[in-house]
Regions:
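Acidic active-site catalytic centers that drive phospho-/nucleotidyl reactions
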Residues: 11, 35-37, 62, 128, ...
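S-adenosyl-L-methionine
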Residues: 45-77
Length: 238
């Protein structure tokens, strides 16, 4: 089925198309979809052959490697022509599960998304993520010593988790090992307290809002539950 609404959609972090299917069902015409995982794109195209029929550009370039101006020229669209930009930016670093590394490279991918928005200037731009994004912060600036300290500590935490899982299987966790974990946890707490007092430790949501407003967009933020829109699960997204 070909799109017939006249509206266009440009989506990044498309995955296998969980969000994109909504636009297809509403007969949006897909101009561009991006994900760096080939199998995701193959699944998306297999389930939606109309994407090829309509000439959608299927791109597996990592979003932080995209030349936005060159892409706009390749697509042959003008500034402000695209109706909707949608990006479910990677959420691993913002999820309430896990260690939430403050310098996780994935935490900064929204900058690449907003660079695309700045170059294309769509009529509507949507960034979707987990509710944990509301409390997420990232470290900016060039304090290499602090970054190195964070990287080493978070690597030690990951190594400890892996070793703990292995020892649990053979019932070999002892008090000394548990004390090591408590020490790492305390070091993490102290480091996070230091970060909270740093002017370079900034709110992700406030940074996104600032960047949008600098481009002239009016920003609305809310947490939506997928069950409100017919999904079989009660899953909240921002």
């Amino acid at each position: 089925m070909s799109a017939n609404t006249g509206y266009t959609i440009f989506e990044t972090f498309v995955g296998a198309g969980g969000s994109h299917i909504g636009f297809i069902q509403e007969n949006f015409r897909t101009v561009y979809v991006n994900d760096f995982i080939d199998d995701c794109l193959k699944t998306l195209v297999y389930n939606n052959p109309n994407l090829i029929e309509e000439g959608a550009y299927i791109d597996n370039t990592s979003i932080d490697k995209i030349d936005a101006v060159a892409l706009r020229n390749k697509l042959g669209v003008t500034i402000g022509e695209i109706d909707v930009f949608f990006g479910g930016v990677v959420c691993k670093g913002f999820s309430l599960a896990g260690e939430r590394n403050p310098i996780d490279e994935r935490n900064y991918l929204y900058h690449a998304q907003l660079n695309l928005v700045n170059v294309f200037r769509p009529k509507i731009s949507i960034i979707e993520n987990v509710p944990g994004m509301r409390n997420a912060k990232v470290l900016v600036g060039d304090d290499e010593d602090l970054r190195s300290e964070i990287e080493k500590l978070w690597q030690a935490l990951e190594n400890y988790k892996g070793k703990k899982a292995a020892l649990r299987k053979i019932n070999k966790i002892n008090k000394a090992f548990e004390d090591e974990g408590k020490t790492l946890k305390k070091r993490k707490e102290l480091l996070l307290k230091r970060l909270q007092n740093s002017p370079n430790y900034i709110s992700v949501v406030e940074d996104i809002k600032r960047l949008y407003e600098e481009m002239g967009y009016t920003v609305h933020m809310d947490v939506l539950n997928s069950a409100w829109y017919g999904a079989a699960t009660k899953r909240s997204e921002e």
